């Protein structure tokens, strides 16, 4: 089992995460809340560094984050986990940023 994957964010997924953090900042008017959200998502994704091998054989490569409020779609390569999309769990489909 491999435990040292690199984590790479696709630009679309990264932009969607930033947009959600901006939305949270706009709604809350509190920079700390928006930063905490952004850092919490990044921290959860960083766990794929050592857990990605578990997902390698699964057909659906998505994980819920922050108590299921958000979903991240990813691919597992030989040495890298590619974060390819990010969305709110309320959204039916992945969309463009």
Model region roles, listed by residue range:
Residues 67-97:
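Enriched for short, Lys/Arg-rich terminal
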Residues 13, 41, 74:
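GIY-YIG nuclease signature motif recognition
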Residues 36, 54-56, 76-78:
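Juxtamembrane/interface motifs at transmembrane-helix termini
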Residues 39-67:
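A short, surface-exposed loop/turn module that caps and links secondary-structure elements
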């Amino acid at each position: 089992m491999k435990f040292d994957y690199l984590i790479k964010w696709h630009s679309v997924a990264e932009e969607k995460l930033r947009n959600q953090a901006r939305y949270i900042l706009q709604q809350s008017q509190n920079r700390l809340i928006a930063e905490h959200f952004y850092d919490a998502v990044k921290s959860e994704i960083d766990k794929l560094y050592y857990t990605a091998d578990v997902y390698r054989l699964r057909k659906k490569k998505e994980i819920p984050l922050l108590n299921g409020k958000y979903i991240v779609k990813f691919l597992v390569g030989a040495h890298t986990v590619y974060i390819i999309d990010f969305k709110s769990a309320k959204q039916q489909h992945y969309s463009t940023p």
